[in-house]
Amino acid sequence: IENYIKESYPDAKTRFIAYGTDLKKSTLTADDYKVRKCFDNWKTKENGYYLIVGRFVPENNYETAIREFMKSNTRRDLIIISNHKNSAYFDKLKHLTNFERDHRVKFVGTVYDRDLLNYIRENAFAYIHGHEVGGTNPGLLEALGHTKLNLVLDVPFNKSVAGASAFYWNKTSGNLSCLINDADGYYDFTEYGNRARAIVKQNYTWEKIVGEYEGLFLNED
């Protein structure tokens, strides 16, 4: 957006300040009641699922992600945390993908408990990020801060945030499913997780973002 403003309005004074997130790990353990309740209800287990978290809108490319996941050979689940209930888009996705025939695809509703959501992120095998419009997306920052392996849609603003810490996919048929198959054959993505957290620590902590706002307002003419 800032680039567009600079190109369209050369005399405008602009300052880009990103969104932020935190790196605090979940305090929950595998034995906690609410953890086990979720995982038992979802019929999944730690490291046994790919994860999507986000608003339930078409521009987040749920259709592509679900289609490609269904093409893949993984035995892991696809856990989708979103506000899908009573949504016409949900019914449309059912019709377009027939995902209800694939026992791996699981829409589980929303999770508003931050500590629990962090645990779910930290124990996902991988996070799939399909957001195609916007800027610094909060969901991507949270994924970089808490999930080792991130499979991210290849668009400029996603790449500008995740850099070399993620694997990228496009909407070409077979692209994401092949990436999932390849990822499923590896077992240690610790280095990618370290890179992702380093990016967040350097660029996207709330302390840094608040400091930038303070600097902006204190230095106003």
What are these regions (language model features)?
Residues 50, 65-66, 78, 143, ...:
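A structural motif in glycosyltransferase catalytic domains
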Residues 41-60, 66-73, 79:
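Conserved donor-binding/catalytic core segment of Leloir-type glycosyltransferases
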Residues 166-174, 181-187:
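Conserved acidic donor-binding segment of nucleotide-sugar-dependent glycosyltransferases
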Residues 145-152:
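Short hydrophobic beta-strand element within catalytic cores of glycosyltransferases
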Residues 21, 53, 77-91, 106-111:
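Glycosyltransferase donor-sugar binding loop
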Residues 187-218:
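A charged, aromatic-enriched C-terminal amphipathic alpha-helix characteristic of glycosyltransferases
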Residues 119-135, 148:
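Acidic donor-binding loop of glycosyltransferase active sites
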Residues 1-38, 44-45, 106:
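Donor nucleotide-sugar binding/catalytic pocket of nucleotide-sugar-dependent glycosyltransferases
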